[in-house]
Amino acid sequence: MLRTCLLLFAVFLGFTQLSAQPLVKISGKVTNETGHALPQVTVAILGQSQSTITDALGVYHIYSKSKSFTLKYTFLGYNPVQINIKQDKAGRIIQDVVLSINPNELEQVTITNKQNQLSNTVTINISDLASMPSVSGNFEAILKTMPGVSPNNELSAQYSVRGGSFDENLIYVNDVEISRPVLVRNAQQEGLSFINSDLLSSAKFSAGGFEARYGDKLSSVLDVKYDKPDSSTAILNAGLLGLAFSSKIVTTNSYLLAGIRYKNNSGVLGKQDNKGVYTPNFTDVQLVYNYNLSPEFSVNVLGNFNSGVFRLIPESRETEFGTLNSKVRLDVDYDGEEKDNYQTTGGAVALKFIPRSNYVLKWINSYFNTDEKEHLDVGAWYRFNKAGAGFGSGNTESRIGRYTNYAMNLLTSKTFSSELKSDQTFSSHTFSWGLRYERKDYNDDLNESYKIEQEGVLVDNKDSFYQGNNISIQNKLAIQYYTAYVQDSYGLSATTNLQLGLRGSYNDLSKEFLLSPRLLLAYRPARNNKIFRFTTGVYQQAPDYRSVRDFNGMLNLNQKAQRAYNTSAGLDYAFDGLGTRLKFSSEVYFKYLDRLIPYMMDNVRLKYLAADEAKGYTYGADFSVGGEFVKDLLSYFRVSFMSAKQDVKNDGLGYLKRPTDQRVNFSAYFQDRLLNSPTYKVHLSLLYGSQLPVGSPLAARYSDDFHIPAYKRADIGFSKDFLDDFSIKKPVFLDKYFSSFTAYVEVFNLLNINNTVSYLWLKDADNVQYAVPNYLTSRRLNLKLVLKFKNSK
């Protein structure tokens, strides 16, 4: 199927190139206003799928298939030029062009914006979201190409930043903090994350050293803002994995954003080693309504309904693992089924008051209710087939066993928050403050059991803290949080800026008063193409239900806040190279954690050792470089190095690797146009994450002597925009109703690499333990259409 579709796509591309012999040869030189040659300028003939680029001397040659045509010259940072040419007969012509600088476009690739200078954040290019090939379809897929983020699971919206856990990341949508489900144990159960990419106007991400205005987590912050449209429009995204529709409606004093998304990735999940009937259905509905009562006062309402139903009737499994000379195959026959339900409803109301042009006051109130139901009743007969070099030749021995996995878990969580915050700008200062109250209520009914038998003999699993034989417990917990912050950003000189902030917090669980000072110093030399940053601060994460619930379901109500001391130094440098404007960013960091709650990680499920306490440290460096090698298509490359270790107090083992100790991470997102057909584009995503430490649940609880292999993945997409600016002969019907009509062909996991996400730990009758790899998704073809309807005033 995949080979046939790719062949058809290649034939289609080839067919579009069929044409008559060239009639006109155009040559010339492209220079700037001072007469200097401009290399790498794109020269295209609109409507003919012909394009080229200028050489190092600014010279180009191109052929036209007709005698009447339009030439278009484009180069990043310069105004585009179009020239209409009409020839009476075939031949050769000389056409020299002078491009003028576009200062507005140059501003987009400089780093002198003061807001970015005073914030240790990276602005995410949201125009990449629709084009980036992603099997999950969630916004968070783009985060895994960000500096400091470790990739290890393409199905999950969860992410680890600089050695931190999934629970250490802050997410804000329109200043409302968003939480994630608690019970999810496998990424295939995850549905649609909260963020609707079609409604976005901006997104910023910080991998550490963020401002005092943001909340009390240890690792990162993602700050997302939804659009404030000035005209009405709609977007339809339809593909093999789901459907999404969003609408933006603008009236005189208000606007409405509406988005509905549906996802069903059964075609992806069905190709895993676990064969069976997969029925995943995920739906998300969001509404944002903003009304301007007056020029000074407005009200903004956000509503959300998110539902996920995951059902699996497993049938069989066949997994081969081991070395080339000592292979083992696990064969499994299943009975039973799994059915999980996740539902979140809620919203927020924000009142915004602007009494003066330099003063903004916001009052934000939110409430979310999440119901999670996990029903798992699966049994499995399994057989190990072992052999040496003759594996598969019949020289095998078999051992039969059975394991059963049961869970009936119900969790209801309710979160209410109210926050008052203000920003006021003076001549050289921006002063901010905020007050926040939050209450979280949890009602948890936890029932789990797991057992293994070999040839009718029950394996004693009483020493397994990780799986647990039987858990049956009911918990109720309410936690109240009180926080406040002040922050001042001001210019010490024309080249130096300082930001000082202080957070204070109290919670009625640990009953601690916490103070977290933070500092950011930025220096911009007079040349205006560099920024040096230094940040230092204290980050404290108060206990919540996830961290106080031990692996056996018991609650440690005496747990104290986790605390990290973070220091980093970085450089942003913008320069011209490779025919475009490039931005290089680097940052080195050190994070010492004197109070840390250890945990074990299995897929996306974290099991905290809530009764224990640890200390740890993380250090590393992030590097990235990016630019528009082709106009309007941003490409970037990044590499990160890191070491993360922890020492659990009183265990006598000293420092061991943290579960997130991924030493090397690399990512690349590269985009290009086909040289002779610029309306066709290619989008390539590459991810690499080195091995992760893991230990057997039946061994010492802090063991890290085993590893999950390195994560390696390549996804590629091909797109064709039928209304691209490079095409002058646009389909009349499409041009009448749509501003963009783009078709995508995507290949997920292009190299079909088996990436391991976790292990199934089993023993045979000889008490030999096996770590059976649980593989992630294999190669998969996807087709989709993204339609953007024309704006209506």
Identify what each model region corresponds to:
Residues 635, 688-695, 720-793:
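C-terminal beta-signal and adjacent terminal beta-strands/loops
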Residues 49-59:
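Short, acidic Ser/Thr/Gly-rich low-complexity loop/linker segments typical of extracellular
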